[in-house]
Regions:
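Membrane-proximal soluble regions of multi-pass membrane proteins
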Residues: 1-27, 199-203, 209
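Membrane-embedded alpha-helical segments in integral membrane proteins
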Residues: 13, 33-46, 97
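Membrane-interfacial, low-structure loops and terminal tails that flank and connect transmembrane helices
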Residues: 16, 104-112, 191-201
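Core segments of transmembrane alpha-helices
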Residues: 31-38, 83-90, 153, 157, ...
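Helix-loop junctions at the membrane-solvent interface of multi-pass transporters
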Residues: 42-46, 96, 140, 187, ...
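Transmembrane helix-loop-helix
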Residues: 44-56
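Functional transmembrane core segments of multi-pass inner-membrane proteins
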Residues: 54, 60-185, 229-240
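Interfacial loop-to-transmembrane junctions
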Residues: 148-149, 186-219
Length: 240
């Protein structure tokens, strides 16, 4: 059983399977480590003010997004259990814990309704906006530019982060993706011998967008919100 302990099992086995000696890819260790760090931070941050709703929501959102990063990077597919299931979970959590969207108290006692409304708005605006971006890009390039999984994933992000977090994730994900691809392209130019022909970047090659959307959503949820939200203050006049 000790070999199956998260993080420690990989270290005890020194990155190799005990039965055959084959190498265990470091990504499993990194996923476990990153998940553990996020959960530990959430426990520390939200138990201080006894906000158990935010603790549950933050751990759930982190688990979903880390799963998307790991799966989409390897398979270029985002399972519906992460995207659609995550959107449903985010909506339910927003209904029971409206503080997820900053709704603490309302004179009319409709905090839960407002929390659910913000979540639903995030789902519709996030997935709808990305759908039309993908549709227009598909027309322009005459090929599929975005997969349906990305559209559904942004609905999940919107359910947890609201419409502002969903909009930020589109553009933040694009920035993160461009930075990563630039660094990867630079590495391939500097050390071409260490880059396989299959992994080399080329114009028209499909790359997963889901991981960058997920990372941008996590960035917003776990710290960037207070810097991003003021940029949308002009929308308050429209009732959002």
């Amino acid at each position: 059983w000790s070999q199956n302990l998260p993080i420690l099992g990989w270290l005890f086995l020194k990155g190799r399977a005990k039965c055959c000696g084959n190498k265990i890819l470091p990504r499993y260790f990194l996923v476990e480590l990153f998940t553990g760090l996020i959960f530990a931070w959430a426990c520390y941050a939200f138990t201080q003010n006894q906000d158990l709703g935010m603790l549950l929501a933050s751990c759930s959102f982190a688990w979903l997004m880390i799963g998307v990063v790991a799966v989409d990077t390897e398979t270029m597919l985002i399972p519906d259990r992460f995207s659609l299931g995550g959107a449903c979970l985010g909506f339910v959590l927003s209904l029971y814990f409206p503080s997820l969207h900053g709704v603490i108290h309302h004179p009319m006692g409709i905090e839960k309704i407002l929390g659910a409304f913000q979540s639903l708005l995030g789902i519709l605006i996030g997935s709808g906006l990305l759908y039309w971006i993908g549709a227009l890009a598909g027309r322009a390039f005459r090929r599929e530019a975005l997969g349906e999984g990305d559209v559904k994933l942004l609905g999940c992000v919107g359910a947890f982060c609201g419409w502002k977090g969903a909009v930020f994730s589109i553009f933040g994900g694009a920035v993160f993706g461009c930075i990563f691809l630039f660094l990867l392209f630079l590495f391939q130019k500097i050390k071409p011998a260490q880059s396989s022909a299959q992994d080399n970047l080329a114009f028209g090659k499909e790359i997963p967008f889901g991981p960058y959307l997920a990372l941008a959503g996590m960035g917003y949820f776990f710290g960037l919100r207070e810097w991003i939200d003021p940029w949308f203050s002009w929308m308050h006049a429209l009732g959002f």
